């Protein structure tokens, strides 16, 4: 089992262990810079700077907990937190309309973020993972509203509690026309990266 151990670099004592976390892809909770810094503040105090936090990757035996392979190099925290996706996600917050299959009625939702390969959307409706959706996203372009249409499959579903309860869905595009792909790229260029 791979584990990341986080260390705080003390000018006098050297590297001091803060704690360990499982590999990111196996960890359902999002590890953020703030969460690691808050953990460090609990243990060390308020004088913690993100530039003084480092991590190493170690391999542990799952049964005994014995360290099998420690990584000898301490790497900066920002390297652990960098986005490793092939296509980076961009924050959107745009209205969308979707249909489940061809004959169903339209339902509403919000695009939370997007990349060239998919969307993260919010919807109050419960839809099973694996469902194919036909999606139309509305966005402003100069003084008009444009529409971007894609087909996508739900690959992840998470319950969220906002003002009204609902779900976040991770969607992977299954079909997108070249014109809509161009619109998406333009939209992504004007958005801020997560």
Predicted regions located by residue number:
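A residue-level detector for short acidic-glycine micro-motifs
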Residues: 113, 154-156, 175
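Short solvent-exposed strand/turn elements
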Residues: 42-44, 127, 165-186
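N-terminal helix initiation/capping motif
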Residues: 65-66, 70-114, 185-194
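N-terminal acidic leader/helix
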Residues: 1-28
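Short, Lys/Arg- and Gly-enriched loop/turn segments at beta-strand edges
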Residues: 141-149
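Short strand-loop-strand
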Residues: 94-134, 168-170
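Short, conserved beta-turn/loop elements at beta-strand boundaries and strand-helix junctions
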Residues: 101, 116, 157-163
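Short, mixed-charge low-complexity intrinsically disordered segments
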Residues: 37-79
């Amino acid at each position: 089992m791979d584990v990341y151990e986080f260390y705080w670099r003390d000018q006098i004592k050297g590297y001091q262990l803060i704690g360990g976390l499982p590999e990111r892809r196996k960890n359902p909770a999002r590890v953020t810079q703030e969460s690691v810094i808050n953990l460090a503040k609990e243990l060390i105090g308020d004088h913690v700077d993100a530039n003084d936090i480092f991590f190493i990757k170690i391999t542990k035996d799952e049964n005994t907990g014995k360290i099998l392979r420690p990584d000898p190099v301490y790497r900066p925290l920002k390297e652990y937190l960098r986005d490793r996706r092939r296509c980076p996600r961009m924050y959107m917050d745009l209205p969308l309309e979707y249909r489940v299959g061809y004959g169903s009625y339209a339902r509403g939702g919000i695009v939370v973020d997007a990349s060239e390969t998919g969307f993260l959307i919010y919807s109050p409706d419960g839809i099973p993972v694996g469902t194919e959706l036909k999606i139309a996203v509305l966005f402003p372009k100069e003084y008009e509203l444009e529409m971007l249409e894609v087909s996508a499959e739900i690959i992840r579903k998470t319950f969220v509690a906002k003002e009204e309860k609902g779900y976040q869905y991770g969607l992977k595009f299954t079909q997108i026309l070249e014109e809509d792909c161009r619109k998406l790229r333009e939209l992504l260029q004007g958005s801020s990266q997560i």
